């Protein structure tokens, strides 16, 4: 019988071929990856297999990995080994292949000794429905956490664009990790890093090395797919910010290459924080807003400049300030000065208005999802008791 050599017969999307599962006592929760190019290449296409199915499963507590690759036919022996490509991204000698019974037996045994981190690492507790959750701040130098992270980190490749594995031997990395308090299931986690921040010659004193300041960075931020949409991301972000706001050595909170969904989460949480604490109640009514006030408030809130300006602009919009339009257009103009300088006046105004409308629509979209506690603002702001929909 002649072999069907049509490319479509032997080609499959790696996103479709890869099947992910988190398994517990009630069965498996199945889901698909968002990205597979870190494993199978930029095209996210696998060639050379007919009816290829790749199964990657994890115990929902220990994250012990299991791999099983199935296909009806392989074009030839020169075809790239899809199983090896996947195993290269998983902890070496830790994966159980094909033998599902052995995998279940192994993770069941591991669960007997699996424990949450020590109580002194606990930074936050919260409830959603009738479930209790806990957030810990831990170091990758902890052997148990290091192994758990080794097993989980492939999820960053599969769900965070441009993600890569971190250097787990660098002691500066910390992880904030969320668990279900009773079941011990890992809900999600974020990797963080702190960099020394140079504050200028006048502020620097080498004799006070213990007082040196740092910039704290959120690197990878992930809530496992089965647990998304329940508010865990918000709780995790708030816990991180709370820790760093209380840390006098941290002068600025940054985020590494945030995607659109994380930007939304960050905007909502940061806006809620400044509004619920009335942090911008003394915002000047002058235009442009005094740069000294901006610098002072940015430092108090530990926000990088771009993020602070976004929050300030959302605040002005929320307060229906007459300064909102001019303040935002001023920033847009300054940011795009070189691109605008060669345009005629009519085109320049059109471009500014288009950018203004686009940002205003985006700000309104974010504000519509913000939860604001009932609060009376200072009389100087001329506003009181405004509430936004949660």
UniProtKB/Swiss-Prot annotation:
Q: Report whether NAD shows up as a keyword of the record.
A: no
Give the region (Interaction with histone H4 N-terminus) as residue ranges.
Answer: 42-44, 193-195
Q: Where is the active site?
A: 256 (proton donor/acceptor)
Localization per record: Cytoplasm; Nucleus
Q: Name one GO cellular component term.
A: chromosome, telomeric region
Any idea where the N-acetyltransferase domain is? 138-290
Keyword set for this entry?
Answer: Acyltransferase, Chromatin regulator, Cytoplasm, DNA damage, DNA repair, Nucleus, Transferase
Q: Which SUPFAM superfamilies match?
A: Acyl-CoA N-acyltransferases (Nat)
Give the EC number(s) under which this enzyme is classified: 2.3.1.48
Is the keyword Membrane assigned to this protein?
no
Give a Pfam family name: Acetyltransf_1
Q: Which residues bind acetyl-CoA?
A: 221-223, 228-234
Q: Which InterPro entries match?
A: Acyl_CoA_acyltransferase (IPR016181), GNAT_dom (IPR000182), Hat1_N (IPR019467), Hat1_N_sf (IPR037113), Hist_AcTrfase_B-typ_cat-su (IPR017380), Hist_AcTrfase_HAT1_C (IPR013523)
Judging by the UniProt lineage, the source's domain of life is: Eukaryota
Family, according to the entry, reads as follows:
Belongs to the HAT1 family.
| Self-association state and partner proteins as the record states | Component of the HAT-B complex composed of at least HAT1 and HAT2. The HAT-B complex binds to histone H4 tail.
Which PANTHER family does the entry mention?
HISTONE ACETYLTRANSFERASE TYPE B CATALYTIC SUBUNIT
**Job description of the protein:** Catalytic component of the histone acetylase B (HAT-B) complex. Acetylates 'Lys-12' of histone H4 which is required for telomeric silencing. Has intrinsic substrate specificity that modifies lysine in recognition sequence GXGKXG. Involved in DNA double-strand break repair.
Name by which UniProt lists this protein = Histone acetyltransferase type B catalytic subunit
Where does this protein come from, organism-wise?
A: Kluyveromyces lactis (strain ATCC 8585 / CBS 2359 / DSM 70799 / NBRC 1267 / NRRL Y-1140 / WM37) (Yeast)
